Every structure is written in C-alpha cells, then in structure tokens.
Amino acid sequence: MSYNCCSGNFSSRSCGGYLHYPASSCGFSYPSNQVYSTDLCSPSTCQLGSSLYRGCQQTCWEPTSCQTSYVESSPCQTSCYRPRTSLLCSPCQTTYSGSLGFGSSSCRSLGYGSRSCYSVGCGSSGFRSLGYGGCGFPSLGYGVGFCRPTYLASRSCQSSCYRPTCGSGFYY
C-alpha cells in the first residue's frame, strides 16, 4: 500500500514489513533508504502510532526493534508515538517504554526539518536521550555513518534512555 505525502511517497511492502521513505519529502531532506519497521497495516489504525507527513495524518507507525529511529514532520509535533513496552533490544542496554510528546518544551530540531523530543535530565552516565554529539555525529546522519538508536526516551525519563552506538551505515 502507498500514500502520497506532499511531494513524496509513503509505502509499505506488507503488513509487518518495512516502510521506505524517499530522500526528500514534504520539503524536508531525509536519509534515503532508511528502514522503519511497523506492525500497523491500516492508515486508520492510529491509536499507538504517530502521524507521519502532512496529508498522512492517519498513517501511523510503531517501532518494533532497536533499529528504528523516528522522523516527524511539522504537523506531527503535537503527536505522540509509543514504542512497544518491555522490548529489550541490542545494542541498547535498556528497554524502551512510555511515550514521547512532540511539540513539548524539550523538543529540539534534528536539523533536517523534523523534530525530536527528549526528557530534560535524561542522560545520566553513558546514556543519551538525543543523539546530538553522540559518537561524533550531530544528529540522525546523512551519508554512511550515524549513531543508531539514541532518540527514544520517556517523558519521565525512567528506564527509557538509550546508549548511543555508532553504526557504519543505514539499516536496509
């Protein structure tokens, strides 16, 4: 299934498969060939996910593994996405739980048109809730190197911080 999202396309190979985003969508520049996993099949199934691009407010996604990083466009800043609770992922050291609030006072731009939230005070010894400076990369990367998943943290910042781990490329 596919949906037109502004100037870009949103497509899903199959239920439980992968979502492939174009290099440019809604006027923003996104990493090409980045893979996002989902277990939501219908654009009307929006209860646990967040809206994606302008014009696709009913299209949601929910990460199912530690490989998943999120992108959000401007209309989605007040949306929340809730990762599956109690998932232990490698190379992360903790599970992710709770939800992220977009548009909150702790939002910071990732530098390519999307916004990311993190919990103030999160980031104790060796953990970061946002990837700025993590492994030497300022944000979710362009090109071959980026720090994978450092972008998930709950509002309360309890047991939901991520340890940044450098990757050599995007997941395909």
Swiss-Prot record:
As for what it does, the entry says:
In the hair cortex, hair keratin intermediate filaments are embedded in an interfilamentous matrix, consisting of hair keratin-associated proteins (KRTAP), which are essential for the formation of a rigid and resistant hair shaft through their extensive disulfide bond cross-linking with abundant cysteine residues of hair keratins. The matrix proteins include the high-sulfur and high-glycine-tyrosine keratins.
Q: Which GO terms describe its cellular component?
A: cytosol; keratin filament
Q: What protein is this chain from? A: Keratin-associated protein 13-1
The sequence repeat boundaries are 46-55, 56-65, 66-75, 76-85, 92-101
Self-association state and partner proteins as the record states: Interacts with hair keratins.
**Gene encoding this chain?**
KRTAP13-1
Return the annotated region ranges for 5 X 10 AA approximate repeats. Answer: 46-101
The record, for PANTHER family, names: KERATIN ASSOCIATED PROTEIN 3-3-RELATED, KERATIN-ASSOCIATED PROTEIN 26-1
The family this protein is said to belong to: Belongs to the PMG family.
InterPro entries attached here?
Keratin_matx, KRTAP_PMG
A GO MF annotation of the entry reads:
structural molecule activity
Keyword Ribosomal protein applies: no
Organism phylogeny:
Eukaryota, Metazoa, Chordata, Craniata, Vertebrata
In terms of Pfam families, this protein maps to: PMG
Organism domain of life? Eukaryota
The free-text tissue note of the record is: Weak expression seen in the late matrix and entire cortex area of the hair follicle.
**UniProt keyword list:** Keratin, Repeat
Q: Does the keyword NADP apply?
A: no
